[in-house]
């Protein structure tokens, strides 16, 4: 592990804003664009409003909205003021949003109109202001001085900067290593959100990591932000890091369907692509799978020399479809389907799979695509150490544990969960099981909490079985559950594609059911799937597209 040297995150932002004053900073895809000077101006006005409202350093400010430029402005204004941003995923239900605003003790809420329609100020008595994020107009104010501050904000700004607002006027709050930077509520598959207390050292360490492994990125860089900015993965590597290097972030403000994503990538031509595996898997199934499974192509892919020519052509077309200008595609947030990964590996597509969690803000392991190994999620990231709680870490899986400046302070107002998060010697328990090879590459087996026990005590990780099932044509996604002593696969089929190929729902389900013996041939005897059940619609998911497993569990 390298020696970690802390740098103030807010001062890094201040320096970047000064250097890139006239460069583009934030855009809504096919919408408004702001230069760094525009962002700084909006931040300054919000700082003045915060002062007039007597918002103190360390006070909490909740932000609940879709990705957009003013989400970024609200977040940056809060943090550079010295207050604590509390990003809340816009897909949460109103009751959950009420709870998180109250639990975090937020004083101010930035929210968009659609979400606010389902909320009630009476259910959030600690708030003294609710702000419409699109326009920064007040939706609710508890005291007159807040209304006055909003009405006269431009006047106050003019008095503070009577001549002009210049880069040298910036003076952002100087943070310290163990100071609370933000509270980020998890959206995990267990159904209970915990407020992860992220310190500034964790943000700094992740920024240093990104600069170290991607030195090609700079103030000429374009990025398409398709992941929720309220989620740590998207926030850090599609937004916050980019702001410290003067890059240009393009927010997808609509639901990021594969069609919209591919359109945006083709137009923006980003220099780096950050994604969850499900997005890449959908692209593979819609654009590539049917081609490579054609009899003639399958045959040619087995012929030496010709196979490399075909693979090179497919890789070239895929790179072009993703904009043709990127260093690599970095995937994280969930397991990558093994069959699809093998295909990407064979065609030499520039991808890599990293590993992290909210509690590490988020990075734990990574390897550049030139240095990666098949099915591994890389080696310990800059400033980080990892270990496996196992008598033989190379052969016997154990819990993955990590240590370094990335790790969280704990869970907000939850001492019991915080205590469970750390080992006696201070390492963070990830709850994930894996092995590590002699060269330090990590291979994840699955979540400890999701693991089943086989008939003779064997460890069965449903994620590994689901990877096999998901590799079959017409399977969008699957979930393996324990069901009265056996294993049942819940499968969500691609009914739309089946229809295009001339199959109704019944025919498609029969086709998939007939493949159960083939599925079972690819998995160990002690983990055989007993039956398949079909989901009429997609699974309920977290914003990072993981299935909410707890909703589908049955009697064991």
Stretch-by-stretch model annotation:
Residues 35-37, 173, 181-207:
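Conserved AMP-binding A3 loop
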Residues 21-22, 150-185, 192, 216-222:
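Conserved pre-ATP/AMP-binding loop-to-beta segment of ANL
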Residues 204-222, 229-316, 325:
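Conserved AMP-binding/adenylation subdomain of ANL enzymes
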Residues 452, 477, 482-488, 516-556:
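Conserved C-terminal "lid"/linker of ANL adenylate-forming enzymes
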Residues 387, 394-454:
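Conserved ATP-binding/catalytic segment of the ANL
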Residues 5, 14, 22-68, 72-76, ...:
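Conserved AMP-binding/adenylate-forming core of the ANL superfamily
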Residues 53, 80, 84-158, 485:
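Structural core segment of the AMP-binding/adenylate-forming
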Residues 271-274, 284-372:
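Gly/Ser/Thr-rich phosphate-binding loop
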């Amino acid at each position: 592990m390298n020696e970690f040297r802390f740098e103030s995150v807010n001062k890094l932002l201040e320096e970047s804003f000064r250097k890139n004053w006239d460069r583009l900073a934030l855009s809504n895809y096919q919408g408004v664009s702001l230069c760094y000077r525009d962002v700084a101006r909006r931040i300054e006005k919000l700082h003045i409003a915060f002062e007039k409202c007597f918002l103190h350093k360390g006070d909490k400010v909740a932000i609940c909205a879709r990705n957009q430029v003013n989400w970024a402005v609200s977040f940056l204004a809060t943090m550079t003021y010295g207050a604590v941003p509390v990003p809340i995923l816009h897909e949460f239900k109103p009751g959950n949003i009420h709870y998180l605003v109250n639990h975090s003790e937020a004083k101010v809420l930035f929210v968009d109109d659609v979400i606010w329609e389902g909320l009630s100020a009476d259910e959030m008595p600690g708030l003294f202001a609710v702000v419409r994020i699109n326009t920064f107009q007040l939706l609710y104010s508890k005291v007159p001085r807040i209304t006055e501050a909003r009405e006269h904000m431009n006047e106050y700004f003019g008095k503070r900067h009577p001549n002009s607002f210049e880069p040298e006027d910036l003076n952002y709050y100087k943070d310290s290593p163990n100071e609370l930077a933000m509270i980020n509520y998890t959206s995990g598959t267990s159904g209970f959100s915990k407020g992860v207390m992220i310190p500034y050292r964790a943000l700094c360490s992740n920024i240093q990591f990104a600069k170290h492994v991607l030195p090609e990125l700079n103030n000429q860089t374009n990025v398409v932000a398709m992941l929720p900015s309220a989620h740590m993965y998207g926030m850090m590597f599609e937004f916050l890091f980019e702001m410290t290097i003067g890059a240009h972030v393009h927010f997808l403000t609509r639901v990021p369907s594969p069609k919209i994503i591919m359109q945006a990538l083709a137009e923006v031509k980003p220099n780096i692509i950050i994604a969850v595996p499900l997005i890449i898997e959908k692209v593979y199934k819609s654009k590539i799978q049917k081609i490579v499974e054609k009899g003639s192509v399958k045959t040619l892919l087995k012929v030496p020399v010709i196979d490399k020519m075909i693979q090179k052509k497919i890789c070239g077309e895929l790179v072009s479809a993703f904009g043709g200008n990127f260093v690599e595609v970095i995937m994280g947030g969930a397991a990558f389907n093994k069959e699809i990964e093998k295909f990407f590996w064979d065609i030499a597509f520039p991808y890599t799979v990293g590993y992290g969690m909210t509690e590490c803000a988020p990075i734990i392991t990574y390897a550049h695509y030139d240095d990666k190994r098949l099915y591994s999620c890389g080696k310990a990231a800059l400033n980080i150490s990892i270990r496996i709680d196992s008598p033989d870490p190379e052969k016997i899986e154990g819990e993955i544990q990590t240590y370094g400046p990335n790790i969280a302070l704990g869970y907000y107002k939850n001492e019991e969960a915080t205590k469970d998060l750390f080992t006696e010697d201070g390492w963070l328990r990830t709850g994930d099981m894996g092995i590590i090879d002699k060269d330090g590459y990590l291979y994840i087996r699955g979540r400890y909490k999701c693991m089943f026990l086989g008939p003779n005590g064997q460890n069965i990780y449903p994620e590994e079985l689901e990877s096999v099932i998901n590799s079959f044509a017409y399977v969008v996604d699957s979930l393996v559950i324990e069901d009265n002593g056996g294993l049942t696969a819940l499968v969500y089929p691609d009914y739309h594609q089946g229809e295009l190929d001339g199959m109704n729902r019944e025919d498609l389900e029969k086709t998939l059911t007939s493949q159960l013996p083939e599925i079972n041939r690819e998995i160990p005897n002690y983990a055989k799937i007993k039956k398949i059940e079909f989901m009429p619609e997609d699974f309920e998911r977290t914003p990072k597209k993981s299935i909410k497993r707890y909703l589908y569990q049955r009697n064991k």
